[in-house]
UniProtKB/Swiss-Prot annotation:
GO terms for biological process: trans-translation. The lineage of its organism: Bacteria, Pseudomonadati, Pseudomonadota, Alphaproteobacteria, Hyphomicrobiales. The keyword Cytoplasm applies. This is SsrA-binding protein. InterPro entries: SmpB, SsrA-bd_prot, SsrA-bd_prot_CS. Keywords: Cytoplasm, RNA-binding. Belongs to the SmpB family. GO terms for cellular component: cytosol. It comes from the Bacteria. The gene is smpB. One of its GO terms (molecular function) is RNA binding. Residues 136-157 are annotated as: Disordered. It comes from Rhodopseudomonas palustris (strain HaA2). Residues 136-151 have a biased composition (Basic and acidic residues).
Length: 157
């Protein structure tokens, strides 16, 4: 019998600073609307979501400031690297996110850009609140202490 070609989730870009700079309340998986050359560039692993954020415009959620560089093999039909990209969500999810942004002063921060099992580009969005400087220091102290604790336990045997 022929074996099935199992596709794993392939993470293309990750926003590692987001968990440090924001207190994450909730996460949502959103589809992302890309052109052909953008998909090829993302499959090559050349996307950056570190400085990006999501915002609502006209009842839709858009990914702003994400960088997907131009696809080198494309000619004149290439895309603009920093254009706003529409995120694909259900209306109920959009209303929930927009309400949290407007009422509670929260932010939509992208955490991961990846391809799911079906080969579709997905974005993991976090509904987050910005941390103050003392909160960031506290997080760093906890992380350092957990590392030190692990070292001490390993040293004792």
């Amino acid at each position: 019998m022929a074996e099935k070609n199992e596709r794993a989730i392939k993470v293309v870009a990750e926003n590692r600073k987001a968990r440090f700079n924001y207190a994450i309340e909730d996460t949502v998986e959103a589809g992302i609307s890309l052109t052909g050359t953008e998909v090829k560039s993302v499959r090559g692993g050349k996307a950056t979501i570190a400085e990006s954020y999501a915002d609502s415009r006209g009842g839709e959620i858009w990914l702003i400031n994400a960088t997907i560089p131009e696809y080198l093999q494309a000619n004149r039909f290439n895309h603009e690297p920093k254009r706003p990209r529409k995120l694909l969500l259900h209306r109920k999810q959009i209303n929930k996110l927009m309400g949290a942004i407007e009422r509670q002063g929260m932010t939509l921060v992208p955490l991961k850009l990846y391809f799911n099992e079906k080969g579709r580009a997905k974005l993991l969005l976090a509904l987050a609140k910005g941390k103050q400087l003392h909160d960031k220091r506290e997080t760093e102290k906890k992380r350092d202490w957990s590392r030190e604790k692990g070292r001490l336990l390993r040293a004792r045997g």
